[in-house]
């Protein structure tokens, strides 16, 4: 009997600037045939409209035509699938993660589905990745980040590096999207790892 399950990732989008990161992570998860359980906060929906021009939540547009892999769950529905600890998945990522969401999770507040799913992910000792995007950080943000790190969350600021010599905004977005997928244990072909980048340079030299 084959008990293997498809890889599942829970993904939350909140109202911090950084919609291109969320879009790219979803595209890459879909390319890897990962099932995506998506919840978008009210301000996250506004973010998608403001930064991507997406007036309606369109799973096909978020995954380059692989909307069949996406299950959208209403952020007001605290009884949705991802709110239950019995729902098995390989990790949750909130990208971008606002300071408001960060503070709520750190305080144990579950006022919406994203916050509830994050709390459940922590209590079940599953992987929770918080792709925070705020600058500068207040002292309250720093304390919340420390508290969540101690609770087991992986704090992943959306701070792309420049050592791979990015030439476009897309290169910067891919840098962080690749890092997030690495943390989730999802395969990708992006040139975002330093050792593989050096090897690729050697192979491509005349």
Per-range role (PLM):
Residues 1-129, 135-206:
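A cross-family phosphate/adenosyl-ligand binding-site feature
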